[in-house]
Amino acid sequence: MGNACRGSFGGKTFQGYPQPQDHSESNSNPKHNSDSPKPKKEQQPLVTMNRTSTNQSYYVLGHKTPNIRDLYTLGRKLGQGQFGTTYLCTELSSGIDYACKSIAKRKLISKEDVEDVRREIQIMHHLAGHKNIVSIKGAYEDPLYVHIVMELCGGGELFDRIIQRGHYTERKAADLTKIIVGVVEACHSLGVMHRDLKPENFLLVNKDDDFSLKAIDFGLSVFFKPGQIFTDVVGSPYYVAPEVLLKHYGPEADVWTAGVILYILLSGVPPFWAETQQGIFDAVLKGHIDFDSDPWPLLSESAKDLIRKMLCMRPSERLTAHEVLCHPWICENGVAPDRALDPAVLSRLKHFSAMNKLKKMALRVIAESLSEEEIAGLKEMFKAMDTDNSGAITFDELKAGLRKYGSTLKDIEIRELMDAADVDNSGTIDYGEFIAATIHLNKLDREEHLMAAFQYFDKDGSGYITVDELQQACADHNITDVFFEDIIREVDQDNDGRIDYGEFVAMMQKGNPCIGRRTMRNSLNFSMRDAPGAH
């Protein structure tokens, strides 16, 4: 089955679980014998909201969109969820197949429901570009539905693969866990908490490749600031962390959930289970992990050590996603990397600093044309770094932010990044400069963005960008100290002294021309875990 939308909007916030009573040993610590239940698909939400009919003429997305049927043909049903249905769809212009999740607006009763849909789309845009996260193609709205068009994953669910196999070898389980926790690390580094990780929410692109995994379904995901505490109880019973049940949690809950998935990968059964939902919650709150039943006596101590550290009852003592990836059981050849990878925004900033002025201005133009849902995540990150709420990031704020995210950059390197992003040489990075420097470069694959940017520079509509037009654009952006002829010469492939659309597109889409230099997109890819000024 393809990109099913089961549960995307199913596990809604509710009033919470009753505090646990005395737990019987039979409920909280059962042995995983031959009668132990296999993990079940979480088909039901933790609570069902009461819904009534309402007028659906409003815009859920907040703006008018093209008619999806002018761009795609909708085909057979791939999956069914509480709020909508996923269909196979084909792009008319290219013939490429995608998945389309159509969400019924009549089921979006409350303001919170509408915000959930918007936020899911925002988060998918924000996480765009990660190889193990399903990519969003676009969002559309008509009077009855919101349609989310995304990458098609036709290889089926990881859950079904687990059921077929029973359980995995340690090496294969380690490789799969590396992918799953890699997704968690990517989410956390961009200030996103998933909140509903489970095997059903990982699809295979290719049914013959166990490792072609893509995370789907960000319907319960939220943006978070470091230190922020969440109290709404969401998720799926088998996988929910104890602190979620106690209504006091943060992104550490995602690591717990990944630990539950790892336990299932190795044993074929969940670590916490009972005959009733409340019994499962009681078992989670007790936190006893069974390593005595088969196959655990035959598995390595290193695997058990990692599970204990991921299923640690105290969130503050639980491993972070990056620490999980550095654990000897996960690492290639049992050797952890000697340094942390650049967080997402940091790597984006590094890439940006290597671009010429024309490309930076073009990215600013593209950034200004992006929809609110495409940049909502970056807006949250900007606010977290702008600790004095001045509307601009100073050198000290950038330096403090990067230090908080574990960066070891020297002051001179941070200054280089600052200067690269500060296109107008004001001494600070304003909101527009930040967005331009940190938008994911997959935006450059979209023809409408490239054409709009080219037309911005081509003031007279001649089909060429001339030196005079480039000079005018720089003046409009308060950019000085630019050698216009040098920019033209760098981009002009046929040496006619001007830039045509093909040359412009080639410049925008080519890789970093200055390998080794720091770029702004690369440097603001920091982890939101310790965002400065966030509360």
Curated annotation (Swiss-Prot):
Q: Which organism is it from?
A: Solanum tuberosum (Potato)
Name of protein: Calcium-dependent protein kinase 5
Activity regulation text:
Activated by calcium. Autophosphorylation may play an important role in the regulation of the kinase activity.
Instruction: Relay the record's extra comment.
Output: Mutagenesis of Gly-2 or Cys-5 eliminates ROS production, probably by impairing the plasma membrane targeting required for NADPH oxidase activation.
Q: Where is the composition biased (Basic and acidic residues)?
A: 32-43
What role does it play? Regulates the production of reactive oxygen species (ROS) by NADPH oxidase.
Q: Which residues bind Ca(2+) 3?
A: D458, D460, S462, Y464, E469
Which residues does Ca(2+) 1 bind?
A: D386, D388, S390, E397
